[in-house]
Amino acid sequence: MHIEILRLGHRGERDKRISTHVALTSRAIGAKKILFTEEDKHVRESVERIVKSWGGEFKFEVLNSWKSYVKKFKDEGIVIHLTMYGENINNVMTDVKKELAKNSKPVLVIIGAEKVPREAYDLADYNLSVGNQPHSEVAALAIFLDRLTGGTALYSEYNDAKIAVTPSKFEKCVSVEKGK
């Protein structure tokens, strides 16, 4: 399944840590691309450094027009906006997964950093809430992606990884391959 994440808004110094966590969570739980509406060199470099060390293909892009991108994406895929004000994920996730299974469409997930423009709600095929209490967009994204992928992305392994962790009951099992 091809999954992309669109982070609407990014408030420079204030958001660089959380935006980095959004990108790393996206990568770790199955997304292939993170899209931002503005450049942040620190976030880009952090993401690229992780991908280089831990492997896999994960793209970082900055959009000129998020609305144009979403409109074009809708021609081929499904757009899901994660918001506290959407439909209950527990009531809608089965429908989302059925639609994706039937059509093998790519998925674009929209999450906000600041007040999300009304157009995001209107352009989305689904506006989903992950809980009705205040929490982080990283938490919402992680829960949604885990449900979407059925947990299969949590232990991904990449042939080009320089660093790999093997789950263990009692010890740290880390492999580091230099020069790879």
Swiss-Prot record:
Alphabetized Pfam families for the sequence: Trm56
EC category: transferase
This enzyme's EC code(s): 2.1.1.206
Example of a GO cellular component annotation carried by this entry: cytoplasm
GO molecular function annotation: tRNA (cytidine(56)-2'-O)-methyltransferase activity
Binding site for S-adenosyl-L-methionine: L82, G112, A113, E114, K115, V116, V130, G131, N132, Q133, P134, H135, S136, E137
Keyword Methyltransferase belongs to the record: yes
Keyword Mitochondrion: no
UniProt entry keywords in alphabetical sequence: Cytoplasm, Methyltransferase, S-adenosyl-L-methionine, Transferase, tRNA processing
Enzymatic reactions: cytidine(56) in tRNA + S-adenosyl-L-methionine = 2'-O-methylcytidine(56) in tRNA + S-adenosyl-L-homocysteine + H(+)
Biological-process GO terms, alphabetical: tRNA nucleoside ribose methylation
Subcellular location: Cytoplasm
Oligomeric and partner information: Homodimer.
Family (UniProt): Belongs to the aTrm56 family.
HAMAP family: tRNA_methyltr_aTrm56 (MF_00077)
Function: Specifically catalyzes the AdoMet-dependent 2'-O-ribose methylation of cytidine at position 56 in tRNAs.
Protein name (Swiss-Prot/TrEMBL): tRNA (cytidine(56)-2'-O)-methyltransferase
Record organism: Methanococcus vannielii (strain ATCC 35089 / DSM 1224 / JCM 13029 / OCM 148 / SB)
Source lineage: Archaea, Methanobacteriati, Methanobacteriota, Methanomada group, Methanococci
